[in-house]
Regions:
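ASCE RecA-like P-loop NTPase motor cores
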Residues: 26-507
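Generic detector of low-complexity/intrinsically disordered segments
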Residues: 9, 25-26
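Short, positively charged and aromatic/hydrophobic N-terminal segments
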Residues: 15-23
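Single conserved hydrophobic/aromatic residue that forms the stacking wall/gate
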Residues: 1-14, 507-508
Length: 509
């Protein structure tokens, strides 16, 4: 029931608040850093948006033309209201650009990046028309995985000066806030704790011991010294014991092991976003077995022994892997059992880690909103064949992105940012539209000319030569990546300095 889920969510957030009350006593404020001051339509737009948030408006639209400085306006609003903020973008490239810009505006605050950590992802699928089963295949980017962990760690810390720039990954399932917060390790100088107890807690937080090579998410032990390669940061945490007392806590450079900083108190966050215990695993296996028997009986009653045998073999193999190794391929399809959720209940996601008064900014909302609403349907359609043909249990349906109405229910106040807001945003804002038309640069929109496609390359060469003669530059857009490459080669053959760019290289992380 929605009310029960809401109460449960509040309890989770309350537990996080209680656990990290120490840091909340020292809440940081946003410090906006910029050599520019708001100009053009920006000052009025900032004032209107801030007034709307303080007035309690649930939705506002920032309608700004291209180049009017909408990102700078949003940064000023964030600094003014001083709330944890989620900025949602519809693709990784734009998210990375926003992340870089926000890091520049808030160098002293927690600006984080949360997108899919797959460099390559082929989802599991079954096509009944050709009887083709496609196994899941993927490649994980370790740097992005680290940034995702850091984003969640910043939220768990209880600090208020957090901006997270995310793609639609923020509506996909992850571990529960309760499980993650319970596995945070609080260390204090002078604390009495047995070394082996610390090692046990590290393993419980999914750090693994490796005394030979210290890699991200591992730890090593040398006498009274425990070195931990923190999973969410590029540092090594060194804990030195004197008998059963923590003598010192230091952050060290992972390459040189030179000390970077000393601490009297330190919070170490888990090495993975999906936490579980042996007790939860045992309960999950029992629940999986029960549902497996129901599904076998279901297929047998339909007279389909092939599907019954298929689901039996696949699930029993998965359970054996979970018992032996603690995981299996496609373990996410059993997430409901490990989380203790009921059938149909939404998964935990990044939004669960935010306080209730967080600010949501949806960039390019005319594209992002339809994308959010489409995620559930696409996921459901793919998994329907897997379940109906005996490749997965029905619980696979519950490893999913949020439905759009679930996403809406989890948000408090939203700013939709777009040059062309759609009907949905305008309806939600009930006419509260903040316009930003005058650019800080004073530049006007260029005059648009539509020319015939005949002899377009010759016409293009003529225009390029005109610009070169004026010591100016030219930007050409093409329909496809291949066209960009071929046109670039053609222009180079005509001795015109040219470079194509059709995807941004990974931002420096």
């Amino acid at each position: 029931h929605p009310r029960v889920r809401r109460q449960r969510q509040m309890c989770i957030r309350d537990s996080i608040t209680t656990k990290f009350v120490i840091l909340q006593l020292n809440m940081s404020k946003f410090e906006l850093t910029s050599e520019y001051k708001p100009t053009g339509d920006q000052p009025e737009a900032i004032e209107q948006l801030v007034d709307g948030l303080r007035r309690g408006d649930k939705a506002q639209v920032l309608l700004g033309v291209t180049g009017s400085g909408k990102t700078f306006t949003v940064a000023n609003v964030i600094a003014e209201v001083n709330r944890p903020t989620l900025i949602l973008s519809h693709n990784k490239t734009l998210a990375s650009q926003l992340y870089e810009e926000m890091r520049g505006f808030f160098p002293n605050n927690a600006v984080e990046y949360y997108v899919s950590y797959y460099d390559y992802y082929q989802p599991e699928a079954y096509m009944p028309t050709t009887d083709t089963y496609i196994e899941k295949d993927l490649a994980i980017n370790e740097d992005i995985d680290r940034l995702r962990l850091r984003a969640v760690s910043s939220l768990l810390s209880g600090r208020r000066d957090v901006v997270i720039v995310s793609s639609v990954s923020c509506i996909y399932g992850m571990g529960s806030p309760m499980a993650l917060s319970e596995n945070v390790i609080l260390l204090k100088k002078g604390q009495i704790i047995e070394r082996n107890e610390l090692l046990r807690r590290l393993v419980q937080s999914l750090y693994t011991r490796n005394d030979l090579e210290l890699q991200r998410g591992t730890f090593r032990v040398k006498g009274d010294t425990v070195d931990i390669a923190v999973a969410y940061n590029e540092i090594v945490l060194r804990i030195v014991f004197w008998d059963d007392e923590i003598e010192s806590i230091e952050e060290c450079d992972p390459m040189t092991m030179q000390r970077i900083a000393k601490f009297d108190e330190y919070q170490l966050y888990p090495a993975n976003l999906f936490m579980t215990t042996q007790e939860q695993t045992n309960m999950a296996i029992k629940a999986i077995q029960d549902d497996l028997m129901k599904q076998i009986i279901f297929f047998e009653e339909l007279g389909d022994s092939i599907k019954a045998q298929r689901i039996k073999e696949r699930v029993e193999y998965d359970m054996e892997m979970i018992k032996e190794l603690g995981h299996c391929s496609g373990i996410e399809n059993y997430s409901r059992y490990f989380d203790g959720r009921n059938a149909g209940e939404r998964p935990y996601c990044l939004l669960d880690f935010f306080p209730e008064d967080f600010l949501l900014v949806i960039d390019e909302s005319h594209v992002s909103v339809p994308q959010i609403s489409a995620m559930y349907g696409g996921d459901r359609a793919r998994k329907t064949n897997l379940v109906e043909y005996g490749f997965r249990l029905p619980a696979a349906f519950d490893n999913r992105p949020l439905r759009f109405e679930e996403f809406e229910a989890m948000t408090d106040q939203v700013i939709y940012v777009s040059a062309t807001p759609a009907d949905y945003e305008l309806e939600q804002s009930e006419g509260v539209v903040v316009e930003q038309v005058i650019r800080p640069t004073g530049l006007l929109d260029p005059e648009i000319e539509v020319r015939p496609s005949e002899n377009q390359i010759d016409d293009l060469l003529y225009e390029i030569q005109q610009r070169i003669g004026s010591d100016e530059r030219v930007l050409i857009t093409t329909l496809t990546k291949r066209m960009a490459e071929e046109l670039s080669e053609y222009l180079l053959n005509h001795e015109i300095p040219t470079a194509y760019i059709h995807s941004l290289s990974l931002i420096h992380i």
